[in-house]
Amino acid sequence: MSKQILILPGDGIGPEIMTEAVKVLELANQKYQLGFELTHDVIGGAAIDKHGVPLADETLDRARAADAVLLGAVGGPKWDTIERDIRPERGLLKIRSQLGLFGNLRPAILYPQLADASSLKPEIVAGLDILIVRELTGGIYFGAPRGTRVLDNGERQAYDTLPYSESEIRRIAKVGFDMAMVRGKKLCSVDKANVLASSQLWREIVEQVAKDYPEVELSHLYVDNAAMQLVRAPKQFDVIVTDNLFGDILSDQASMLTGSIGMLPSASLDTANKGMYEPCHGSAPDIAGQGIANPLATILSVSMMLRYSFNLTAAADAIEQAVSLVLDQGIRTGDIWSEGKVKVGTKEMGDAVVAALRNL
């Protein structure tokens, strides 16, 4: 029986990078006889233009029926002035929520070939391999009440709510500990328990879950200290588990330790490891249509999909090896280019990975 993968290119550079990722996926499908069937649909601004909403019901139904979803990126200035509840980003939040994709895995890995592209000294980041586990369907992005009200003095006041239940914290903590068990058996939980009630509960529940994982060394950091430590001594971290807002910020910060956010994939998983896979970067409307975007994060998202949703380790390893071989050849898109390397565009980078994968 074939496995269904839904392709959602999205907006901005999304269609360009997705074209290259699909080329790699189709080659892997053929080379390793994976039995995948690919279907395509729209999300975000493209869905607003077509359906009037950022995520159509029929698209959501296709996502529910699929075994995995591969996403490009959403959003752009074209849709910035429309009502907040129907902006492109709401489609992304809705599909995560409706599919129950509560666990977001964001690796921050520095390829040795890109040590000179990092914003930090090579001796600080060499060998960097961090996994950030971010809670994805709770917290301040989904909390109610939220809105804007007029105070008695006529001034407008905006407000949001940051709620977390015990069960939401417990399930993401388990993901963090499970990831730590198959890596370096070190887990750092990041919160703001000195200020926030939700973080106080977060820390309490993480401590409870830790009792089931005696082999894992657990530490806690306040988010402001964690942000500082990521720059000061990032290799002290192995797995970080944190909430939605903090994870959003810290994972982008960690991405720059690797040289470019254009290198970083992500996985968003439900309780059964059905997932949606996407690059960590956004839609980059400023470079959309120029053919210069880095497709490697999306290609590596394909590898994560094969690994986490389908347990196809050999095919996943092969894609990662192909990317590494291309970097060995000195091939670079502009965001990771340095003197003496070969600067290429989006399509050329995708073609290079396809060629490397074909020759493995």
From Swiss-Prot:
Q: Which GO terms describe its cellular component?
A: cytosol
Q: How does it assemble?
A: Homodimer.
Quickly give the catalysed reaction: (2R,3S)-3-isopropylmalate + NAD(+) = 4-methyl-2-oxopentanoate + CO2 + NADH
Sites where the protein binds substrate: R96, R106, R134, D224
Question: Per UniProt, what is the name of the gene that codes for the protein in this document?
Answer: leuB
Annotated site (Important for catalysis), which positions?
Answer: Y141, K192
Q: What is the lineage of its organism?
A: Bacteria, Pseudomonadati, Pseudomonadota, Gammaproteobacteria, Pseudomonadales
GO terms in the biological process aspect are: L-leucine biosynthetic process
Q: Name one GO molecular function term.
A: NAD binding
What is the designated name of this protein?
A: 3-isopropylmalate dehydrogenase
Q: What EC number(s) does its UniProt record assign?
A: 1.1.1.85
Cofactor: binding details: Binds 1 Mg(2+) or Mn(2+) ion per subunit.
The residues the record assigns to binding Mg(2+) are: D224, D248, D252
Native source species: Pseudomonas syringae pv. tomato (strain ATCC BAA-871 / DC3000)
UniProt similarity note: Belongs to the isocitrate and isopropylmalate dehydrogenases family. LeuB type 1 subfamily.
For this protein, the record's Pfam families field holds: Iso_dh
